[in-house]
């Protein structure tokens, strides 16, 4: 069986390294390119020196040449970089797995438009467990009667630049949709000072940043006399890497369209 040629954007970052390590462990995948931005100190070094995997792929900033020999680009970078890579992938017909978070509504529209020509998986979290969490939240939000206050608490490492996390926002979207609410109108991002009593229809978000926390997410449904907490805790980035590569395999059966991990895992 011919292995899939996988290019990795942001290859020297925490997620990039985890993805390259996971590719090296798979018989049906091959690292075709390790990509970074111009000026990155690791350019021209062998990617294997960063991951302890077999040598053979030099870290490059030449996206056009690298992607010409790739089936799929896996991208966990920043919105501006991802959109630049998206334009190149669209031109070359290369599929994309996008784990980047922090996109504006307008930027998401650009991705949707590109999906008319190439197949894309866009997901704020590639973990199997987190995507099962989304389904559990939908069930809980529909089943619980009125009178349960909803709070979402997330924690990540000190280097994460966006808040709340894309996963936390997706949790809020799932709950709001299940209860026929508009998240933009009911979301409360942090509280400070004399806030007054809590409005019953709001969904609160709390953010923690510190240390090397990979990712913790909790949805709290607080009623009178009881509370329900649904939590996911990631202990290794390998779980996100494995999910991203599962998404890459899924994309090889699609020519175009925008998908998420619910599609990949058959949960929809």
UniProtKB/Swiss-Prot annotation:
Its main location: cytoplasm. Gene3D superfamilies: Dihydrodipicolinate Reductase, domain 2, NAD(P)-binding Rossmann-like Domain. Catalyzes the conversion of 4-hydroxy-tetrahydrodipicolinate (HTPA) to tetrahydrodipicolinate. It comes from Nitrosomonas europaea (strain ATCC 19718 / CIP 103999 / KCTC 2705 / NBRC 14298). It is found in: Cytoplasm. It catalyses: (S)-2,3,4,5-tetrahydrodipicolinate + NAD(+) + H2O = (2S,4S)-4-hydroxy-2,3,4,5-tetrahydrodipicolinate + NADH + H(+); (S)-2,3,4,5-tetrahydrodipicolinate + NADP(+) + H2O = (2S,4S)-4-hydroxy-2,3,4,5-tetrahydrodipicolinate + NADPH + H(+). HAMAP family: DapB. SUPFAM superfamilies: Glyceraldehyde-3-phosphate dehydrogenase-like, C-terminal domain, NAD(P)-binding Rossmann-fold domains. NAD(+) binds at residues 10-15, 36, 99-101, 123-126. This is 4-hydroxy-tetrahydrodipicolinate reductase. The active site is at residues 156, 160. GO terms for biological process: diaminopimelate biosynthetic process; lysine biosynthetic process via diaminopimelate. PANTHER family: 4-HYDROXY-TETRAHYDRODIPICOLINATE REDUCTASE 1, CHLOROPLASTIC-RELATED (PTHR20836:SF0), DIHYDRODIPICOLINATE REDUCTASE (PTHR20836).
